[in-house]
Amino acid sequence: MPVPIKRLNANAPDFEPAFTSLLDRTQPFDASVDQAVRDIIAAVRREGDPALLRLTAQFDQMSLDCAEELEIPPERWRSASESLDCGLREALECASERIRAFHEYQREASWQVEQADGLRLGQQVTALERVGLYVPGGKAAYPSSVLMNAIPARVAGVEELIMVVPTPGGQISDAVLASAHLASVDRVFCIGGAQAVAALAYGTQTVPRVDKIVGPGNIYVATAKQQVFGDVGIDMIAGPSEVVVICDTGANPEWVAMDLFAQAEHDEQAQSIAICTGAGTLERVGEAIDRLLAGMERRSIIEKALAGQGALIEVTSMDQAIEVANRIAPEHLELMIAEPAPWLEKVRHAGAVFCGYQIGRASCRERV
C-alpha cells in the first residue's frame, strides 16, 4: 500500500499554497500541558526527592524505595559498556573520537588588547561549573544525544556533567549508559520529563542544581525548559526534528528513502522532505519508500510522520532545488548530488549540511 506522502511540483500553479501549508508547523498552545508542567515544577521545588519518587512511579511505572535509588551507579555504566556488541562499541568509540576532534576546533580563546592610552580590553572565556544533560528515553534510545552534548561540554572545560534519562518500567538502553561512561559523565539519574528538568534547575536533596540544561525532549520537557529559563540557562526550545534531501538522477533512491525514514522515526511530528530534480527521480524515491517501509521496526511512527509532514517535491533545476531548500531552512540538509561543492556556498539557511552520494545520515550520521 503506497505511503500517503505529499507530492508537490515547484512549477505547478498550486505550489505556493501547498508549500506554505507544508511549512506551517505552528504548535497550538496547550493550556493543559502548560499547567501540568507548572504543577510538576512546583511539586519538585516544594518537596524535592519525595516528589521525584512519586512522579517517577506515576510516569515511568518504576517504584523506588528511596531517593538514593534514583542515581544509577558508575559500575552499571561500565558493565553496560562491556556488554555491548563489539561492533556497536567500536562505532560509539569512533563517533566519540570524531566528535571530540571536531569540537576542539570550536574552542574559544581568551584575549586581551592594549589601547594607545594603556587601557587593556579583553574577553575572558570561562566554562560553566555544572551542566545538566537531558537524554530522551521514551520512544527510542539515543546514545548520540549523550555523546553530542557531553563531549563538547568536556572540550569546553565544564567541570561536572549531570545526566538524567527516563527509564520506563525500569528499562534503560545499555548503549545510552555506555555512552555516558565513554563521555566521562559524572552522575546519571533515572529521572525523566518535566520533573527531571525541575530537579536540575532547582536541585533536590539528591540531584544537584546545575548552571545550564541541554538536550532534547518531548513537549513536556520543552515546556519545562521554557518555564525554568531565567532561573537556569538552557540551550534552546527544540521543536520536532527535520531533514531535507536534495537528490539528482545519480542518487540511490533507497538511500534517500532510508534517510527520510531515519528522521521520521524520531517522532510523529518529525519532517522529512526530498527535493528531486525531475519526475523520474521523484518516482523512484517514492517507489523505494513504499517498498522499504514494511521492513522498518518503527514503521507506524515513520508512516505517520511522512503522511503528516513529509513531502516529495519535484524541481527542474539545482538552482530551484536550493531556492526551495533555503525557504525551508532545515535542521539537516543533504546534497545527494553529483557535484555538491559548487552548490554548498548557495546554501544560506540550514543547520548541518551533508554533501555527496555516500554521506547519507542513515548510514553515516552527523554524529560520526
Mark where each language-model region is.
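N-terminal Rossmann-like NAD(P)+-binding subdomain of aldehyde/semialdehyde dehydrogenases
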Residues: 1-129
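Short acidic-hydrophobic, aromatic-tinged amphipathic segments that line or gate anion-handling sites
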Residues: 3-11, 187-192, 312-317
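Conserved small-residue-rich beta-alpha loop and adjacent elements
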Residues: 113-178
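Conserved NAD(P)+-binding/catalytic subdomain of aldehyde/semialdehyde dehydrogenases
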Residues: 184-271
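A conserved active-site cap/scaffold subdomain adjacent to cofactor or substrate pockets
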Residues: 236-308, 312
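Small-residue-rich helix-loop
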Residues: 346-351
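Conserved small/polar residues in nucleotide/adenosyl-binding loops
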Residues: 362-368
